[in-house]
């Protein structure tokens, strides 16, 4: 088993999503001692946001017309796609920032969502090319967005489920911790509940 571990929180050791992704990966390793893990810290080693020259590398067949910096970004894009395609389980740390995901995580998504590599266009519509993988998302929020009037503000989990589904990955599970900014007791309770839920999610990922 190969695990791709993505962190995107800017909060370092204070990050709840990092606590959860580390716990998820540890449990995957315990149950699969031979597993290999690739860790990408998208906040510490940020991926430059997509621009025209970088996107052109998705279709390029040579070095003509590109400078050294752009060619390095083309190589980075290829490495990121290769890691995704080679992995069996993707563990994503995705805190909610302003109702969506961190821009650092979006930058990774923009690099790996490549026509002809991770999805393709057909006469009947797009088809994902990365099926058979499993995604476990550590979803963290300062408030409550899974239910009630604020549920309509959630452009985090729905977006991730949609984009991974577009790439062909339909097995997307969430380990959620909410109300993290509502005091120490609420934070502790949320993390405890998330850790409890994590065991079932990991077991499902391994068993399926």
UniProtKB/Swiss-Prot annotation:
Reactions this protein catalyses: 2 a quinone + NADH + H(+) = 2 a 1,4-benzosemiquinone + NAD(+); N,N-dimethyl-1,4-phenylenediamine + anthranilate + 2 NAD(+) = 2-(4-dimethylaminophenyl)diazenylbenzoate + 2 NADH + 2 H(+)
CC cofactor: FMN
Broad class of enzyme this protein falls into: oxidoreductase
InterPro entries on file: Flavodoxin_fold, Flavoprotein-like_sf, FMN-dep_NADH:Q_OxRdtase_AzoR1, NADH:quinone_OxRdtase_FMN_depd
EC number: 1.6.5.-, 1.7.1.17
HAMAP family membership: Azoreductase_type1 (MF_01216)
Protein name, as recorded: FMN-dependent NADH:quinone oxidoreductase
Source species taxonomy: Bacteria, Pseudomonadati, Pseudomonadota, Betaproteobacteria, Burkholderiales
């Amino acid at each position: 088993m190969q695990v791709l571990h993505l962190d995107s929180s800017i909060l370092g050791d204070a990050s709840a999503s990092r606590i959860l992704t580390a716990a998820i990966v540890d449990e995957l390793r315990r149950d699969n001692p031979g597993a290999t893990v690739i860790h990408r810290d998208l906040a510490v080693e940020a991926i430059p946001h997509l621009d025209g020259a970088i996107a052109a590398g998705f279709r390029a067949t040579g070095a003509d017309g590109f400078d050294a910096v752009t060619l390095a970004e083309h190589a980075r894009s290829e490495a990121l796609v290769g890691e995704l395609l080679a992995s069996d389980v993707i563990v994503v740390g995705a805190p909610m920032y302003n109702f969506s995901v961190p821009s650092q995580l979006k930058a990774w998504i923009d690099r790996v969502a490549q026509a002809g590599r991770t999805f393709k266009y057909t006469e009947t519509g797009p088809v994902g090319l990365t099926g058979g993988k499993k995604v476990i998302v550590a979803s963290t929020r300062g408030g409550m967005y899974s239910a009630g009037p604020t549920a309509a503000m959630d452009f985090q989990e729905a977006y991730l489920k949609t984009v991974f589904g577009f790439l062909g990955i339909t097995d997307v599970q969430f380990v959620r911790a909410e109300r993290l900014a509502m005091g120490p007791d609420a934070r502790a309770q949320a993390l405890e509940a998330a850790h409890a839920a994590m065991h079932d999610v990991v077991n499902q990922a391994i068993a399926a």
